[in-house]
Amino acid sequence: MTEVRTRFAPSPSGFLHVGGARTALFNYLYAKAKKGKFLLRIEDTDQDRSTEASFKIILESLKWLGMEWDEGPGVGGPNGPYTQSERIHIYKEYTDKLIQEKKAYRCFCTAEELEGKKKQADAMGIPYIYDGKCSDLSDAEIGSQLEKKIPFTVRFKTPHKIVIVDDMIQGKVKFESKLIGDFIIVKSDGFPSYNYAVVIDDALMKITHVIRGVGHLSNTPRQILIFEAFGFPLPRFAHASEIVGTDGKKLSKRAGATSVLAFRDLGYSSETMRNYMALLGWTSPDGKEYMSDEELCSVFDVERCSKSPATFDVFKKLKEEEKESVDFNKLTILGLAEYLNPKSKLNWMSNKYIRDTKIETLGKALEPFLKDCQIPEAFKSGENPQLLSILDSVRVYLDRLIQAPPYIEEFFLENLSFENDEAKQLVLEGKGKEVVAEFYRIVKESSLTTPDAYKESMAKVGEITGEKGRTLFMPIRAITTGKSHGLELPILFSLLGQEKMVKRMEQLAGILGISLR
């Protein structure tokens, strides 16, 4: 049985966004499910756009997502080099073969000449197809042009036929090659075109399955024609559905497209991101959504992918006035956080992951988010028992680990003050002073240790004072935190303990100049 070999082949011209990451994941999961190999290949033939910085970001993104490649940059393998700019000599060898066999030819048409023909076709309302002007040049004519060092491209001589793409997701799709024309396979700078290099690379690297986004479906007939011209065996093709935002439109910088590393910095785990992205266009056999890596790798099959667009629901739908001004690529992490959809499937998965994961694992994952946390240095270690105790108590409230530091900081506050006059007035107005005095008495006289015990104590204060809702809870929040908004009080109180609670209330009451007795 032939070994399954898949590949992810990004261009290093930007960050790795969700669409590209999903493509990588589908290839990775399919290879693992079939006990095959997952390759990484860097397609940097567009020298104007390719950068070393982007290359490094792509590698960092894949490593964070936990998608280790079996062959590729940094790993090596028997089918390298795995960077296209290092394979130019290989492409030239195959190009010479095509030209010799009259399956390709040099084209000396100038850019201005071709642009004029394109404009003419546009004016007539017909698609532009190269007219084959250079396809029948004599050897003498070609030699003369080469001697003059006239720049040229190399075009593939497209045979007229019906090309059928037998796609594992989209089904059978037919294309008429005469509508494609003789397309460029080598650019004037000597670098191969995308559609040309990818075929040679896939063939020599023994790729058996090409899994990518549906946007590449229109490229596939060109690639099939090149496969056939060389006599290479065809891989299986699978084109995954488009990913759209909450507005139903294709992901873009105006509709939620951003680097996958932004989700790391927002506090999502790589496990959660893998799980979420796997469901962008694919469903498990039993309909299960929250899945471990082992489960995903055991049941993933591209033939269960849908043709329908997959909705990326992580960000809220932008308001009309925001659509032109908001650029997700340029937003800071805090800026991105403001647009997160609190009811997204990613948040649900992330909360479940945080609740279910071993607390020691969470503690280590939390460490990067504690660097700027206003707590003693000793507590910035994910192994600190007291830190883990706090994290264990509040984890149920977290959708992202970046939300944990405020809880932790609150626990360590020593010298409290009121954040503003609004917080002060919560205690001073109405029955505020009566509420806080009664709560102080109950806390000081009782041994309260659990969130439920503190809930009961606040309810008891309500019965005694006749206050409820905002006029009950807000004065208590103000006298214990100095703030008008914040964390879940019962959880906070149980973490602080009786001694700190009493000290806090006495400290803030002193600032107001009121008695709690």
UniProtKB/Swiss-Prot annotation:
A motif ('KMSKS' region) lies at residues 250-254. It is found in: Cytoplasm. ATP binds at K253. It is an enzyme of class 6 (ligase). Keywords: Aminoacyl-tRNA synthetase, ATP-binding, Cytoplasm, Ligase, Metal-binding, Nucleotide-binding, Protein biosynthesis, Zinc. InterPro entries: aa-tRNA-synth_I_cd-bd, aa-tRNA-synth_I_codon-bd_sub2, aa-tRNA-synth_I_CS, aa_tRNA-synth_I_cd-bd_sf, Glu-tRNA-ligase_bac/mito, Glu/Gln-tRNA-synth, Glu/Gln-tRNA-synth_Ib_cat-dom, GluQ/Sye. GO terms for biological process: glutamyl-tRNA aminoacylation. A motif ('HIGH' region) lies at residues 10-20. Its EC number is 6.1.1.17. One of its GO terms (cellular component) is cytosol. It catalyses: tRNA(Glu) + L-glutamate + ATP = L-glutamyl-tRNA(Glu) + AMP + diphosphate. PROSITE patterns: AA_TRNA_LIGASE_I. CDD domains: GluRS_core. It holds the Pfam family Anticodon_2. Zn(2+) binds at C107, C109, C134, D136. It comes from the Bacteria. HAMAP family: Glu_tRNA_synth_type1. This is Glutamate--tRNA ligase. It comes from Leptospira biflexa serovar Patoc (strain Patoc 1 / ATCC 23582 / Paris). The gene is gltX.
